[in-house]
Regions:
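Acidic, glycine-enriched loop/beta-strand segments at the rims
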Residues: 88-98, 142-151, 159-196
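Hydrophobic face of alpha-helices
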Residues: 74, 132, 148-155
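Hydrophobic alpha-helix feature that most strongly marks membrane-spanning transmembrane helices
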Residues: 67, 82, 102, 106, ...
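Flexible loop/turn segments at secondary-structure boundaries
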Residues: 1, 55, 83-87, 115-119, ...
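Active-site neighborhoods of metal-dependent hydrolases
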Residues: 1-143
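C-terminal cap of metal-dependent C-N hydrolases
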Residues: 28, 100-106, 111-112, 180-227
């Protein structure tokens, strides 16, 4: 669906299916999907993360699947959508841009990784390792930002921006949300081929005053709560 133009998605799934099947609108879709693929780095840069219809496609590029099916990549993309869709990992970011943005004082650290059951499909490894990657790669190894700046971007800055009082800081009266780690031990283990791996080096995590990770292991506690803007 990431390659499908918005006009084709108007009025829901049934209308999208009709447009993909109608010769006139399908020709238009093929042209626009081809353009969208090119803007995203090409078919070889699009990796299937999860396919409910055909799990054998997971981990393969759209280019590989198209070659296997003897189709143009844009045709394959439309066929995958018609069959129920698939989630993708897209390699189309500039490392220089990422580091420049990371250095800005207003940049917060987050992730749009999907919340899928552990072991289900091949989601982007950021689902498990986004924050560990920043601490390991961009703080410790590449020294793009300081540890203090990185921690602020993950804690007090988001809390301030979203109006979450008594969050993101360690002080009397604030909620006890704590992460205890040694910077030199933080290590991202999730990969594109094996993404369901929890990052290493987090000794303890406390949520709302309750320990949820102890000695690197999950406890059975679930003290999290939905936060609303104050």
């Amino acid at each position: 669906g990431a390659f499908i133009p918005r006009w084709a998605q108007v009025d829901g799934e049934a209308e999208l299916q009709r447009r993909m099947g109608a010769p006139e609108t399908r020709r238009r879709l093929i042209e626009e999907v081809r353009t969208n693929l090119r803007r995203r780095g090409g078919a070889a840069s699009q990796i299937i993360a999860f396919s409910r219809q055909d799990r054998s496609l997971e981990g393969r590029s759209l280019a590989d699947i198209a070659e296997m099916r003897r189709q143009a990549p844009e045709e394959t993309a439309l066929d995958l959508v018609a069959a129920g869709g698939a989630s993708i990992v897209s390699f189309n970011m500039s490392e220089d841009d990422l580091e420049h943005i990371m250095r800005q004082s207003y940049t917060m650290t987050s992730s749009d990784g999907g919340l899928v059951p552990m072991g289900d499909g091949k989601p982007h490894p950021r689902s498990y390792g986004a924050h560990a990657r920043k601490l390991e790669r961009y703080v410790r190894n590449r020294k793009v930002v300081s540890l203090e700046s990185a921690v602020r971007s993950m804690t007090s800055l988001p809390a301030t921006v979203f109006g979450l009082t008594n969050r993101g800081v360690i002080q009397t009266g604030a909620w006890a949300d704590l992460a205890i780690f040694k910077p030199g031990e933080i290590h991202e283990t999730a990969t594109y081929n094996d993404p369901h791996q929890v990052a290493q080096g987090m000794h303890a995590v406390v949520v709302n005053g309750i320990v949820v990770i102890e000695n690197g292991k999950f406890t059975s506690a679930a003290p999290g709560r939905v936060l609303s803007k104050n």
